[in-house]
Amino acid sequence: MSRGRRLAVTGLGAAVVAAALNAVVAAVARAAGVDLEVTGGEAIPVSGIAFVTVVLSVLGVLIAAALSRWSGSPVQWWLRTTVVLTAVSLVPPILAAADAATATTLVALHLLAAAVVVPAVARTLRTPA
């Protein structure tokens, strides 16, 4: 199997796993009383969390595919890029969250998705073509 195909399969699999884990964590948080409402009273649905996790993870896999094709050191660039993007992704939950429990949960969801997708894709990028 080519590296591109392995990257697509691994990346999509990691995206689905990350989305499922995020959905479970969000549902548990909601059951524990975290309202997951951002400023303005807009509640974030669990299905929305899962959907956005998949979409942004797939976008990350596309970035990895581009790095694999056009970079001499795709793993290093993947890790640098994902560290920056993960850090940037933590800003909106902190700024938009209505309360500390919601902000903490949203930050945890971002970090959980990164903890699943980033190493899975990095391992695939390390595999010879």
Where are these regions (language model features)?
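Membrane-helix boundary connector in multi-pass membrane proteins
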Residues: 91-105
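Internal alpha-helical transmembrane segments of multi-pass membrane proteins
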Residues: 7, 65-84
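Core segments of alpha-helical transmembrane spans in multipass integral membrane proteins
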Residues: 46-65, 80-91
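Hydrophobic alpha-helical transmembrane segments
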Residues: 8-16, 50-54, 79-83, 104-108
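Membrane-interface helix termini and inter-helical loops of multi-pass transporters
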Residues: 31-42, 97-98
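Transmembrane alpha-helical segments of multi-pass membrane transport proteins and ion-pumping complexes
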Residues: 18-30, 57-65, 114-119
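Membrane-water interface at the C-terminal end of transmembrane alpha helices
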Residues: 10-18, 112-129
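N-terminal signal-anchor transmembrane alpha-helix
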Residues: 1-29
